[in-house]
Amino acid sequence: MMTLTRRDFSRLGALSLAARFAPSLNAQSSSRKTGYAVIGLGRIADHFMRAVRQSSTSQITALVSGHRDKADRIAAQYGVPAGSIYNYENFDEIVRNPAVDAVYVALPNSMHAEYTIRAAKAGKHVLCEKPMCLNVAEAERMISACKTANVKLMIAYRCHYEPTNLRAIQLIRSGALGQVQAIDSPFGFNISPGEWRLSKKMAGGGPLFDVGIYSLNACRYLTGEEPEHISAYASVIDHDGRFNEVEENIAWTMRFPSGIVASCTTTYGANMAGYFRVYGSKGWLQVDNAFSYEGLRITAEYQGPKIDELNPARDPSHFLAEADHFSHCVQNNLEPQSPGEEGLRDMGYVTQIYRSAGIAI
C-alpha cells in the first residue's frame, strides 16, 4: 500500500479541485474572513468549528444554542463575544450583526428549513448540513427564500471537496476504468436507543436520511448522471422498540441513462463500513471509509498501474475544505458546487426510494 504524505494529498486535492472548480479559483479572495454563526452546538458543529479555527478564509463570529452555559463555554474557546450569542427565540436579531456573513445550520433535520429561511430573511448566506430538510416542498422553499434574499445556499456535502473522492471521480472521467457498468455502496451503523434520529418528526426518516444519503449522492457524482429508475425494499429485523417510527434497513437499486446500475444498502441495525466500489469494462476502483472523516483509502486495478493510496489527512480536514469553498464563494459572489438544488434532487430521490419501499413520508 502506498501511503501518501499530507502534502501529496493536499497537492492532489488542489489539482482535482482546480480542475473541477476552475472558474471559481480564477477570482481573487477577499482579505477579510467570512464570519459564521453556528446554529446548533452538537457533534457535527464541533467538527466544523475546529476546522474553521484552522482556516485562513473563515472564522466563527456567533453562536446559536438553547443552552446558554454550553454556548458561553464554546464562545470562550473561539473568541465569540457575549453579544453574539443567540438562542432560538432571538435568532432573528442576527440581522443587526455585521460580523456574521453566513450561518452554518447544524440542527436536527426537522429544523433545517426554518432556520435556513430565517437566516436568508436576515440577509445571511447559508451552509446547511445534509440531509437538506424533510421533503421536496421544504427544499423548494429554502431555495426560494435564499434567491429572494439574494444570498447563497450550499448543502454541506463534504465528500464533494475531499481529495480521495475527487481522485475516484478523476479516474472514472478519464476513462481509465472503461465504461462503468455497476456501483455498490453500503453504509450504516448500529444506532443507540433514545437518539433523536429515531424520531420521524425530528429526522424525517431512518438511516436513508442520515447515512444512506451518502451512498445515494455518491452514485450520482461518480456517474455524473441522474437515475431514471429506482426500486427499493425496507425491513425491520430487530423488534426492540427502536424502529417504531423509522425503518431499520433499506436497500435500493438505481438505473442511470447510460445503463449503469447502482446497488445501495443502509441500516441502523448493524455497523456497516461505508464504501463504494465501481466496476468498469477495463477495471475497478474502491474507496474504503469513503464517507468517514479520516482514513479514506482508494484501491484500483485497471490497464494502468495498480493504485493503493491512503489519505493521511485527519479530521476535520473535510470540514475545512467545505468551509473554505463556501467562504470563497461568498467573498467572490460565486455559486457553490453543492448548491440547494443538489439537496433538492436528493430529496426527490429519497421520496422515490421510500415510495418504492412502501413507506409513507
Which role fits each region the language model picked out?
Residues 3-4, 8-30, 102-104, 326-361:
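C-terminal helix-rich "cap/oligomerization" subdomain common to oxidoreductases
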Residues 12-79:
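N-terminal Rossmann-like dinucleotide-binding module
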Residues 83-145:
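Beta-loop-alpha module in the N-terminal Rossmann-like domain of NAD(P)-dependent dehydrogenases
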Residues 87, 128, 153-155, 264, ...:
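Hydrophobic residues in well-ordered beta-strands that form the structural core
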Residues 133-194:
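A contiguous active-site-proximal alpha/beta segment in oxidoreductase catalytic domains
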Residues 193, 197-261, 265-271, 341:
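Rossmann-like dinucleotide-binding domain that binds NAD(P)(H)
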Residues 236, 240-246, 255-322, 339:
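NAD(P)-dinucleotide binding in Rossmann-like oxidoreductases
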